[in-house]
């Protein structure tokens, strides 16, 4: 039976239960079922198919692999809830698969592991162009990966993991990522992609704890854009470039970045950062502590041979400052450069342009705009 033009047709079972529908790119029906297990068992997805989920809650029996150009469409981020994880397994050649995930919530509580990685909500491998639009991602885990592993792909539980083999582009738009526990990141970039963009998106980690990250850049060359986006963390680093560099980071259009280090370049060199368009970068006390102090922007090394040099940070028509949630007991500089280890960071440029404001705390008589000192913890 060939059914044409079914995208706006509502399919129901005999008991009036709405069906999940799979549609081919030419508009014909692939399959429909009210039960996700039944649909996955009997459905063979083809290139450019669209799978439409009606309102409801659906539990994936296992990680859902997407190895073709596929669209997963819900009826709204507050109406369609998927519980489980998704693997976007892109192509191994130069032609990227085109994957879209739109209009739904993804709740995931992975199992704690002691070795290997803790399964991310969405993982990308291979060459894929991924769009996540109008979604909510709830990173509910209370477990961790292998916390002693120096690779954050395995040490952290990542909402979105762009793996070591990931290529192509990733765009996260009109989406909220909620971090609910320690040792989590919103987006971890561990591969070399053409572009990673967050647009009108929010990463919210306002819980006490440690080792949370908004955007964690762990690979060189991938350009990253943070556009009209809010990142709010109670601890650690909103945008953290660790052993990255030779790339462009753009923060623009009234993005609001607030955490224990809004931007931290750690053992990262040759990075070009441009903050513009009324954006705000705020350093604050960790977990509302009275003596934890850091900075809005930091550059540092940790006694390694990697270094942190030749970075250029341009701040244009934007705000850089500090915020204390509780009583202030320590001085806190808006911009901090660690000069305590060899090799000392050198040849870094910080350029203020336009109507930029750099603010310190009110009760310091001779505030320091740029501080040199020990590595932050």
Which role fits each region the language model picked out?
Residues 3-54, 59:
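Acidic Gly/Asp/Thr-rich repetitive segments characteristic of extracellular carbohydrate-active
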Residues 6, 56, 75, 85, ...:
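Solvent-exposed loop/turn tips at the surfaces of repeat/solenoid architectures
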Residues 27, 48-71, 77-85, 235, ...:
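N-terminal extracellular ligand-recognition/capping segment immediately after the signal peptide
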Residues 70-121, 134, 139-146:
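Right-handed parallel beta-helix/beta-spiral solenoid domain characteristic of secreted/periplasmic
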Residues 85, 112-123, 143, 157-161, ...:
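Structural detector of coil-to-beta-strand junctions
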Residues 109-115, 140-156, 206-210, 283-294, ...:
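Acidic/polar low-complexity surface segments
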Residues 142-161, 166-168, 172-218:
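Solenoidal tandem-repeat scaffolds enriched in leucines and small polar residues
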Residues 268, 290-345:
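Intrinsically disordered, low-complexity segments enriched in Gly and acidic/Ser/Thr residues
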């Amino acid at each position: 039976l060939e059914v044409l033009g079914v995208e706006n047709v509502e399919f129901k079972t005999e008991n009036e239960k709405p069906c999940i529908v799979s549609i081919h790119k030419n508009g014909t029906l692939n399959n429909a079922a009210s039960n996700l297990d039944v649909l996955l068992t009997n459905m063979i997805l083809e290139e450019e198919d669209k799978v439409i989920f009606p309102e409801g809650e659906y539990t994936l029996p296992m990680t859902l692999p997407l190895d073709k150009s596929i669209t997963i469409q819900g009826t709204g981020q507050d109406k369609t809830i998927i519980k489980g994880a998704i693997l976007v397994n892109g192509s191994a050649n130069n032609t990227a698969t085109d994957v879209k995930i739109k209009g739904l919530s993804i709740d995931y509580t992975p199992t704690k592991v002691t070795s290997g990685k803790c399964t991310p909500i969405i993982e990308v491998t291979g060459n894929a162009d991924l769009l996540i639009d109008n979604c909510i991602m709830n990173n509910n885990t209370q477990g961790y990966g292998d916390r002693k592993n120096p690779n954050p792909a395995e040490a952290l539980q990542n909402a979105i993991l762009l793996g070591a083999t990931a290529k192509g582009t990733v765009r996260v738009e009109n989406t909220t990522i909620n971090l609910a526990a320690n040792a989590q990141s919103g987006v971890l970039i561990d591969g070399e992609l053409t572009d990673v963009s967050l647009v009108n998106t929010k990463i919210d980690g306002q819980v006490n704890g440690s080792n949370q990250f908004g955007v964690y850049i762990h690979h060189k060359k991938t350009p990253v854009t943070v556009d009209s986006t809010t990142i709010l963390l109670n601890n650690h680093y909103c945008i953290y470039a660790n052993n990255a560099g030779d790339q462009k980071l753009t923060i623009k259009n009234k993005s609001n970045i607030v955490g224990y280090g809004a931007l931290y370049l750690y053992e990262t060199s040759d990075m070009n950062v441009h903050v513009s368009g009324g954006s705000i970068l705020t350093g604050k006390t960790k977990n509302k502590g009275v003596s934890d102090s850091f900075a809005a922007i930091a550059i540092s090394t940790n006694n390694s041979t990697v270094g942190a040099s030749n970075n250029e940070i341009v701040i244009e028509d934007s705000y850089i400052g500090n915020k204390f949630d509780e009583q202030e007991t320590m001085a806190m500089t808006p911009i901090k450069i660690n000069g305590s280890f060899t090799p000392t960071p050198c040849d870094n440029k910080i350029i203020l342009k336009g109507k930029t404001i750099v603010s310190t705390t009110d009760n310091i008589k001779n505030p320091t705009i740029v501080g040199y000192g020990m590595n932050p913890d």
